[in-house]
Design a protein with these regions (language model features):
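Core catalytic region of metal-dependent phosphoesterases/phosphodiesterases
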Residues: 2-95
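Long, contiguous hydrophobic alpha-helical segments, chiefly transmembrane helices and signal peptides
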Residues: 9, 51, 102-105, 147
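Generic structural signal for conserved hydrophobic packing positions in ordered secondary structure
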Residues: 59, 93, 102-104, 145
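Alpha-helical architecture
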Residues: 6, 70-72, 102, 124, ...
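Catalytic phosphate/metal-binding cores of nucleic-acid and nucleotide-processing enzymes, i.e., regions
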Residues: 3, 21, 140, 178-182, ...
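Amphipathic repeat-derived elements
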Residues: 1-13, 28-30, 93, 141, ...
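Conserved beta-sheet core of the metallophosphoesterase superfamily
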Residues: 84, 88, 99, 106-179
Length: 187
């Protein structure tokens, strides 16, 4: 499966359009959104092109191609206007033989780990900072950064997961990091 992974749109129609243009170029089987879809939250400035109703109108027609987890800014009210589920705290996926625990990052993160076996992957957004680091027993922590409000001078970005591994890209599609799926250290 070819999976596109993005996080933290925070209601930006401007960056949602760019993400969906990247989706059109990439042609993934699914788009995994790691939370904070419509609301910007009290700690963030309004993102460029803040228009949650436009984001709703862009995402609802794609409901069959979307997988989502709940972010700390996502609420039951958001779920009422979206035609796809967004309120799960996490999703379990697979990248080759490795389990991927996908979550937003405000509950489960490297400081508060979910149950992970040797070689499993923790994937979350929330920080708005792209990340790829090994920890524990061959585990990986991965973060796509933010499509709309990147922090620490990072790019507006997303990730791709293919059979060969992960690639971090800016919204124009330029690759700035790759990580091969090497399971020699996996369970």
């Amino acid at each position: 499966m070819k999976l596109m992974i993005a996080s933290d749109l925070h209601g930006s129609a401007f960056y949602c359009r760019q993400l969906l243009a990247a989706m059109e170029r990439e042609q993934p089987d699914k788009l995994l959104l790691l939370g904070d879809i419509l609301y910007h939250g009290p700690r963030n400035d309004l993102p460029e092109g803040y228009a949650p109703k436009e984001v709703i109108a862009m995402l609802n027609p794609l409901r069959e191609r979307l997988l989502c987890v709940r972010g700390n800014c996502d609420t039951e009210v958001d779920q009422m206007v979206l035609d796809f589920p967004i309120l799960a705290d996490y999703a379990l996926l697979y990248a080759g033989s490795r389990a991927v625990f996908a979550t937003h990052g405000h509950h489960y993160n490297t400081a508060c780990l979910p149950p992970l076996a040797k070689g499993d992957i923790l994937l979350h957004g929330h920080t708005h900072v792209p990340a790829w680091q090994e920890f524990g027993s061959g585990n990986l922590y991965l973060n796509p950064g933010s499509a709309a409000i990147p922090k620490e001078n990072s790019a507006h970005s997303y990730m791709m997961l293919t059979d060969s591994g992960f690639a971090w890209k800016d919204l124009e599609g330029s690759i700035y990091h790759t990580l091969a799926l090497d399971c020699s250290n996996c369970g």
